[in-house]
């Protein structure tokens, strides 16, 4: 399972969302910078904090032209309860096949119980990886302030086609 590096195209993942419509990443995010978050599960306090942080920063992220999507192996009911609890407005996927997602993205998988370890990607508007953050445990993850700063930097210092 190779890791995704800057410049690599993000693989196509079709995810079921609690909103009812499946989405295909990165196609559904094309044209904007995007953050793709794999979180361990609703039971993880660090994941809850990260998701809340991205929700709190939603206006700043939107103003910077950054979209967010998150997913985990949790079932629909657990995922919907998490989204409701934190009033998450970005798409949240559920029921991810940890082995398939790991094979496509290089994310680490906890063997028992099976779940994806925290992994985050920043994608450019063409669906290529700008930054990948892999964690083999509870800590080490993207934060919205860093993402906004990175995208602002890229827009200011890149060729017009990349902005």
Predicted regions and their residues:
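Chalcogenol-based redox active-site neighborhoods
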Residues: 1-163
